[in-house]
Amino acid sequence: SLVGGVLISLVCLRQTDLKALIAYSSVAHMGIVLSGLLTMTYWGLTGSYALMIAHGLCSSGLFCLANISYERMGSRSLLINKGLLNFMPTLSLWWFLLCSGNMAAPPTLNLLGEISLLNSIVSWSWITMIMLSFLSFFSAAYSLYLFAYSQHGKIYSGVYFFSVGTTREFLLLMLHWLPLNLLILKSNFCMLWIYLNSLKKMLICGVNDMKLFILDRELFS
């Protein structure tokens, strides 16, 4: 899964379609999630759960931004969606915040998930550090590639007007970004399902022990 994540990251660096790049970045992140799950450790499970929540928010926000650009430019190609800092300056901040979240920059929940996953995967085998270093580097590379190529450079010559975002779009992006950054302050919510699962197992074991105790008393009475 780590090798697959590195290969998909290389594919991301060759994409010229906004939505394809974001979709491939999701596949690359799921490579490290799968590795963490396969270690079958506590940190692996909690890190995978946290990263899936974080990437669900971050990836959804990036898809939203890609759709906003598509509605105005009429194309998803990076060859046309460039120079957006001049065309849509009000949305450039959101591109930066969500692209930095996609590369697990602090204080996003992605950072917490990746630290937990790195801990679990390296504890399973130190050789995985090689692939993890490549995966982390290329994750930052394609996130910066997405932001720099779309926001900077000369604006597409077929565009002759200036565009601003609407209140609905800003609210939608804010509701993606706020949980992504605030959940790290209360990260035990991300581990809640593990606590509930452990409590369920304890209750089942307690009920089974009680049944055995009652059965033993009936046999010896």
Swiss-Prot record:
One of its GO terms (cellular component) is mitochondrial membrane. One of its GO terms (molecular function) is NADH dehydrogenase (ubiquinone) activity. It catalyses: a ubiquinone + NADH + 5 H(+)(in) = a ubiquinol + NAD(+) + 4 H(+)(out). Changing residue 221 to N: In strain: Arzag. GO terms for biological process: ATP synthesis coupled electron transport; electron transport coupled proton transport. It holds the Pfam family Proton_antipo_M. It is a multi-pass membrane protein. Its EC number is 7.1.1.2. Its main location: mitochondrion. InterPro entries: NADH_UbQ_OxRdtase (IPR003918), ND/Mrp_TM (IPR001750). Keywords: Electron transport, Membrane, Mitochondrion, NAD, Respiratory chain, Translocase, Transmembrane, Transmembrane helix, Transport, Ubiquinone. The chain crosses the membrane at residues 20-40, 45-65, 78-98, 121-141, 170-190. It is an enzyme of class 7 (translocase). It is found in: Mitochondrion membrane. PANTHER family: NADH-UBIQUINONE OXIDOREDUCTASE CHAIN 4. Belongs to the complex I subunit 4 family. Core subunit of the mitochondrial membrane respiratory chain NADH dehydrogenase (Complex I) that is believed to belong to the minimal assembly required for catalysis. Complex I functions in the transfer of electrons from NADH to the respiratory chain. The immediate electron acceptor for the enzyme is believed to be ubiquinone. This is NADH-ubiquinone oxidoreductase chain 4. The gene is ND4.
